[in-house]
C-alpha cells in the first residue's frame, strides 16, 4: 500500500495496528490431498492430440474433467499465456488474483488454478512441472507467475 499521508491518523490507530494477526488462507486448508492420486494417474495417460502453437499466436482446445494436458516449450525461450474457461459456462474463467492469494505469485505442482466469482472453484491442478528446477533467480524472478493478467494489448497504451 502506498502511504501518501493525505489522511489523519484515527485516535485508535495504535490499537488497530497492534491487532493479532489473522490468517486469511491457512496453509493446511489449501493442501492438495489428491496429489498422490493425480501423480499415479499421470502414469496411465495416453496422448490423444497434439497442438503446436506458433510464436505470437494462440489456439483453443477443450480438456474434459479428469483429463490431463501438457504445455511444453520445445524450441527457444518462450512466454506463454494460459486462459482457462469452463466450456459449459464461459462466464467462469481463470482468476489469477484468487490463485495468487492462495498460492503466492508463482505456482507449481499441487497448486490449483481457481475460477472467478461467483464460482471460485478449481479449474485445473498442476500435476507436473518441468521447470521446477528453476526456483527463484538472483532478481527474485521465477516461472509460472500469476502476478498480473494475461497478455493485453491495451496495457502499453495506458497513460
Q: Model features per residue range: what roles?
A:
Residues 1-159:
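Acidic, Ser/Thr/Pro
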Amino acid at each position: 500500500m502506498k502511504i501518501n499521508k493525505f489522511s489523519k491518523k484515527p485516535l485508535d490507530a495504535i490499537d488497530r495496528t497492534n491487532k493479532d494477526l489473522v490468517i486469511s488462507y491457512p496453509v493446511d486448508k489449501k493442501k492438495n490431498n489428491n496429489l498422490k492420486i493425480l501423480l499415479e494417474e499421470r502414469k496411465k495417460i495416453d496422448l490423444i492430440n497434439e497442438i503446436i502453437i506458433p510464436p505470437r499466436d494462440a489456439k483453443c482446445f477443450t480438456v474434459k474433467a479428469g483429463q490431463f494436458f501438457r504445455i511444453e516449450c520445445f524450441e527457444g525461450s518462450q512466454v506463454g499465456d494460459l486462459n482457462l474457461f469452463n466450456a459449459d459456462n464461459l462466464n467462469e474463467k481463470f482468476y489469477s488474483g484468487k490463485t495468487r492469494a492462495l498460492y503466492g505469485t508463482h505456482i507449481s505442482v499441487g497448486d490449483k488454478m481457481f475460477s472467478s466469482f461467483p464460482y471460485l472453484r478449481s479449474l485445473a491442478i498442476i500435476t507436473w512441472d518441468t521447470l521446477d528446477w528453476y526456483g527463484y533467480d538472483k532478481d527474485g524472478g521465477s516461472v509460472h507467475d500469476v502476478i498480473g493478467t494475461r497478455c493485453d494489448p491495451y496495457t502499453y497504451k495506458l497513460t
